[in-house]
Amino acid sequence: MKIYNTMTRKKEELVPLVPGEISMYVCGPTVYNFIHIGNARPLVVFDTLRRYLEYKGYKVRFISNFTDIDDKLIRRANEEHTTVPELADKYIKEYKTDAEGLCAEPATCNPRATEHIPQIIKLVETLIEKGHAYPVANGDVYFSVRSFPGYGKLSGQSIDDLESGARIEPGDLKRDPLDFALWKGAKPGEPAWDCPWGKGRPGWHIECSAMSMELLGPTFDIHAGGQDLIFPHHENEIAQSEAATGKPFARYWMHNGYINVDNQKMSKSLGNFRLVRDIAQEFDLEAVRLFLLSAQYRNPINFTRELIEQANTALTRIRTARERLAEAKEGPATAEDESFIASLAEHEKRFCDAMDDDLNTADALGAMFDYARAVNTFVTEPRSKEALERAAKLFDDMTNVLGILQHSKSEEFPKEAVALLNERAEARKAKNWARADQIREELKAMGFAVEDSKEGAKLKRL
């Protein structure tokens, strides 16, 4: 598999540190609000990468953090008249609900910054001892950017370029405009922890360095996140981590592109933020996941209602093909069955070739749709048990990697819909055709179709 490495600006063969294992860290959310569609993209993209690596046989250690102490959390907690820990707990729970809706598998570990304060303090102490950081009178500790010769290597920015736009804000005690805070001295009414240079709390960048190295070691395979994190967050992570350990930090850097809404950049000023929670009121989040995978992950993607509706239609086509495959009648083996079995390897190869090419989910979806069409044609006649089983395995492998058709595996139909279906059966038994037709329309309004067969009626999602 080749992936585009932001550090080297080229596609590289993915060769893990430990054969057969992948260590991976994805920057998670600052938990002060519900997540929006922009937050959902890295969640879905890197969950898909993890799924594909596991499909290829790798053991993946997947870490994604929660930033649960930050200026934004403090402000929001004050607005909601609650504490920072209570606010963080609330939105971590909401995040997990949205992640489940988007079919993202739970991470191996979701570390919280506040659970790693001792490791953060130790890392800051190491940087001070090595001359890469310095405390100031108000309890802040700053990283000395010029002390790290490789600063700017991820973002491609030189010290000279950065220097021209840098300035020291009033009240800052840092020695150089380029320096950034590792630790912030305590302020009244803010959470604070004891440390050798006085009470305070960690800066954002040091949190991810401490947590990733604690859980994955000083050097690990993949560090990922949104494009907006390249500078300054990931650049600062590299500087402080490599300055502390003297070792390379992450070996591969992956970044997903931005999301626009109706061809405009998503921003608070435009009021066009789209919360996943709100989108879920109108659309199946599996369709949203499919939409997010419909473009190459490094490219920008445009969120529109029309495109989500198209993704919903596409998801229905895939779901229908899988249902037809499950319901296909068995028959004696034929030459056509053997021919179809032989074609499975080519379908799988096309899918994997796309995924191996820097996680090209757009082309992988194309391979999935072509396979679904082939399945639809194949199951119009009775087929051998072996052919049907092998066809189903490949279908499920593809959908499992993409993280679609996951809800149907675990989700039961709503009790209200099942009750209406049973009532309709009674109405038909009593030859009350008007009521039976009325119930069909009620179910349709709820998003379900009724399919009648010799075995009885069953529900199907529209």
Q: Across the structure, where does each feature detected by a protein language model lie?
A:
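Short phosphate-binding/catalytic loops that engage adenosine nucleotides
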Residues: 58, 132, 448
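Structural preference for alpha-helix termini/caps and helix-kink/transition segments
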Residues: 265-266, 272-462
